[in-house]
Design a protein with these regions (language model features):
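Extracellular loop and loop/strand-boundary signature of outer-membrane beta-barrel proteins
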Residues: 37-40, 94-100, 136, 215-219, ...
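Residues that define the transmembrane beta-barrel architecture of outer-membrane proteins
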Residues: 1, 17, 45-49, 64, ...
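Sequence/structural signature of outer-membrane beta-barrel proteins
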Residues: 28-32, 73-77, 117-121, 138-142, ...
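Outer membrane beta-barrel transmembrane domains
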Residues: 31-35, 151, 157-271
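Transmembrane beta-barrel strands of outer-membrane/channel proteins
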Residues: 21-27, 68-74, 114, 131-141, ...
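Long, hydrophobic/aromatic-enriched structural stretches that serve as scaffold segments
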Residues: 12-82
Length: 271
C-alpha cells in the first residue's frame, strides 16, 4: 500500500517509504500535588490518550514525515488512573487535584516535518560527524504550531537514520532503510556517538494550556515561543540503539515559575 503513496517525492527512483503505527498516553499536572482545589496560576490537569498513523518517505539525505494522531483528552484518557498506578507501584504521593482536569474532548493533530542531513565519515576510523536540520508544522485542536531546529552528531559508526527520536509529533526517525550497517562498525558490532539538538516552536494553540475547545475549563496564558535543547549519548550494538538525553525546555506559560528539564532514556531495535 505505501508504495502507492507518492505525494512527497513522486516516483523518483530510489525513494523509500515507511508506514508507522504508534500509540501513547501523556499526562500533565501542576507542580503542587497536595492541593485539591483549582490552582489558577498553574497549568491544568490533563490526560491525552491517542493512536497515531504516520507515513515517511526518504530520498537520499532527505526525510519527510506526515503523521495523524487521533484520541481523547479528559477523564476518558485515564490519566489519573495511570498516574495513580505508577505512584502506588513506586510508593510516591498521589496528585490530589484530578477533579479539576480538562473535560472529555476528541483530540486530533496532523503533523508534517521535513529533515535534511549532511555529514562526513572517515572510512578508516569510522569516526564521523553530521548535521540534521528539520522544519515543520502541526494543525489540530490538540496543538497548532510551526517548528524548526537541528541536531549535531559526532562519534563512531553513526547510524544511517535522522537523529535521536524526539518526544514530539513527527519526531520519529527510524527511517526506511535505516537498518544497522555492518560496513561501518568495528567487528560489525558497535557504535557510539554524542549529540546536541534544539527545536523552536511558534505556538498558536496548545489545548493543555489553552483548555478545552468547546467547553469552559481551566486555562493559563501560554508563551507563543517555546524552545527545547538536548544533549545526550547513543550506544549501538548491532540493531539495538540505547540513548540517553537531558532535555531543557523554556517556559510554556506566562506564570510558570521556572523552565523545565528532564531526562529521557530510550531503547529501540531496527531490523
Amino acid at each position: 500500500m505505501n508504495r502507492r503513496l507518492t505525494f512527497f517525492h513522486g516516483r523518483h527512483k530510489g525513494v523509500e517509504r515507511n508506514v508507522i503505527i504508534s500509540g501513547a498516553q501523556q499526562i500533565f499536572t501542576p507542580e503542587d500535588e497536595t492541593e485539591t482545589e483549582l490552582i489558577e496560576d498553574d497549568r491544568p490537569y490533563a490526560g491525552w490518550l491517542f493512536l497515531g498513523l504516520g507515513y515517511q518517505t526518504r530520498f537520499e539525505n532527505q526525510l519527510d514525515t506526515l503523521e495523524l494522531r487521533l484520541g481523547v483528552i479528559g477523564p476518558a484518557a485515564l490519566g489519573k488512573e495511570a498516574q495513580d498506578f505508577i505512584h502506588d507501584l513506586r510508593g510516591f504521593a498521589k496528585f490530589q487535584g484530578w477533579d479539576n482536569q480538562l473535560r472529555n474532548e476528541p483530540g486530533v493533530i496532523a503533523v508534517w516535518e521535513h529533515k535534511r542531513k549532511k555529514g562526513y565519515m572517515n572510512t578508516n576510523s569510522r569516526f564521523g560527524v553530521d548535521v540534521i536540520g528539520h522544519a515543520g508544522f502541526a494543525l489540530g485542536n490538540v496543538g497548532t504550531y510551526a517548528n524548526a531546529g537541528a541536531e549535531f552528531r559526532m562519534g563512531w559508526a553513526i547510524p544511517d537514520d535522522f537523529g535521536t527520536s524526539a518526544i514530539r509529533p513527527g519526531g520519529e526517525n527510524s527511517t526506511p532503510n535505516s537498518v544497522w550497517n555492518p560496513s561501518i562498525a568495528v567487528d560489525r558490532n558497535w557504535g557510539l556517538h554524542a549529540f546536541v539538538s534544539f527545536d523552536v516552536r511558534l505556538v498558536a494553540q496548545d489545548i493543555f494550556l489553552d483548555g478545552n475547545t468547546f467547553k469552559t475549563s481551566h486555562s493559563v496564558d501560554k508563551e507563543h515561543v517555546v524552545a527545547d535543547a538536548a544533549v545526550g549519548l547513543s550506544f549501538l550494538y548491532r540493531g539495538v540503539k540505547l540513548s540517553y538525553a537531558h532535555i531543557f525546555r523554556s517556559k510554556q506559560f506566562e506564570l510558570q515559575d521556572h523552565s523545565h528539564s528532564y531526562g529521557s532514556l530510550a531503547i529501540s531495535y531496527t531490523f
